[in-house]
């Protein structure tokens, strides 16, 4: 699994967003992308980012948006919102293969393989997916999954030690 750890400054994203049920999101999010591209009003906004808000008020749903950095667009078009992403350290995973299967498979690998064994802990805030303007159905299509992380803190006999 190819990844890198990077520090990013805070940023604002312009997103067309909707709430999704956790249990049905894997099938519903690809439909949301189809709707995004089918609507001419949204063709004016480049869709090279997806953002998933992990701060949940209801554990069974989350907010997911499609869009771009707000600095790339003037104003906020109807149907869009600005999402402020704080400064974080990010784990950035390279994903290769056709969408949506490649990105869904990589999420599964991150959650089952990387997170349980890495020295990093996921910060439950915003996750990002970066998409290139190439053909997303291509076998060699490249995208990225970016999750905010921090070094895990280990406890030893009533003493807290921060991993460096």
Give the residues covered by each predicted segment:
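A solvent-exposed interaction/effector surface
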Residues: 1-164
